[in-house]
Amino acid sequence: LDENSLFLDEGKNLLIEEFGKEYATYFSILSLISSSRTSRREIESVLQKNIGGYLERLENEYHLITRIKPILAKPASRNQKYVLEDNFLNFWFRFIYKYRSTIEIGNFNYVKKVIKRDFSTFAGKFLEKMFIHFLASSNKYTDIGSYWERGNQNEIDIVAINKETKKVLLAEVKLRPEKLNTRILPVKARKLFSLLKDYEFEFKGFSL
């Protein structure tokens, strides 16, 4: 990462023309989502404005974000998050756009330190996707997703359910195996125990 890096302005070049004069608001929303401020309430509390229209366009017109709900959520549930699907844009908004003022004054060492510090947490989300795809391709489960309660409480990275065998796999995903703590999963899953009373639960940790 230095002043000659080609991708410093890549995200901006890709989207600024598309978004037009309101690009700053769109960029702020995408930067917050990439930094795990994923609910409408969280984003609006930072930006201090109604962003319903922006989210709708980002999802349905620009196809940059996707709205997701926790596994087993009812169709009418308002407990939902937004995720930025493109891996490059996720990185760019998380580490380049967010620290653009630091980059503008040439303090690349600071940004490198931030990337080194936060990358394992950032990459963990992509690792989650990989393991979800792996479990889905095994054809052992009827439902697979993530779980969380309101306010992003009791987050469980992967919940895989087999309705036929009445078995549930709960998994924590970390980039580094030493960071795994599967003992917390039964505590986070208390509501799931009541929703899936007759099911057998298994707890695992996935890492590289």
Feature annotation, model-predicted:
Residues L1-L89, F93-R94:
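Interdomain hinge/linker elements that couple catalytic modules in large macromolecular machines
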